[in-house]
Amino acid sequence: MGNLISFMKEVAEGLRKSGNYGTAHVYRSSMNAIIAFNGSRNLSFKKVNQEFLKSFESYLRRKNCSWNTVSTYMRTLRAVYNRAVDRHIAPYVPHHFRYVYTGTRADRKRALDKEDMERLMKELPKRLCQENKELQRTRALFFLMFLLRGIPFVDLAYLKKHDMDGNTITYRRRKTGRLLTVTLVPEAMKLIKRYMNTDPASP
């Protein structure tokens, strides 16, 4: 039988090379959680039985992981396991993940209230002029992500100069491949000009 950790690392690297950075990150996070639980990188697929899965689930809950985080790790592990079965390096077990949680739950409210958002947007520009440069940059990037209609950080980080045309930015989502166009408000344009790489050789 093959080694789960080695195979998971191989899959994550393949995802990264194909540009699926978000998914690759999830695979690596799941892999690290499994290593922490197992205590070593030596873990054969044969040992990943239903008892192991249930124990891993209990471990994640003891670490205060939400049920949605548990589900993400389990679904990732299931996807890796199924790939390994297809490659004949893991044993096929019907309904192998039946007894662990792989659903979704609304554990808690994640959106800010309107009042909180208004206060944040009012105070944030002021603080950008009052704090150390590292914190200024962090707050500025958060503000910019909001102004760009909630652009994910990975997409913001991979923006190129040619993505901007006048007062619009057109970019392709790293996660879905979908092409999106966002109109730049003056505040967003100021932040982009402040933090963009001015090196002529930089894309």
What do the PLM-derived regions correspond to, one by one?
Residues 27, 73, 117, 135-139:
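Short, leucine-enriched amphipathic alpha-helices that occur as contiguous helical runs
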Residues 54-55, 90-125:
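Flexible interdomain linker/hinge and immediately adjacent N-terminus
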Residues 77, 141, 154-157:
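Alpha-helix N-cap/helix-start motif at helix boundaries, enriched for small hydrophobics
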Residues 158-200:
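Conserved tyrosine-mediated DNA breakage-rejoining catalytic core shared by Y-recombinases
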Residues 24, 111, 125-143:
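Conserved catalytic core of the tyrosine transesterase superfamily
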Residues 62, 86, 122-130, 162, ...:
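Conserved helix-loop functional segments at active or binding sites
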Residues 33-36, 46-47, 62-96, 149-151:
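N-terminal DNA-binding recognition helix of tyrosine site-specific recombinases/integrases
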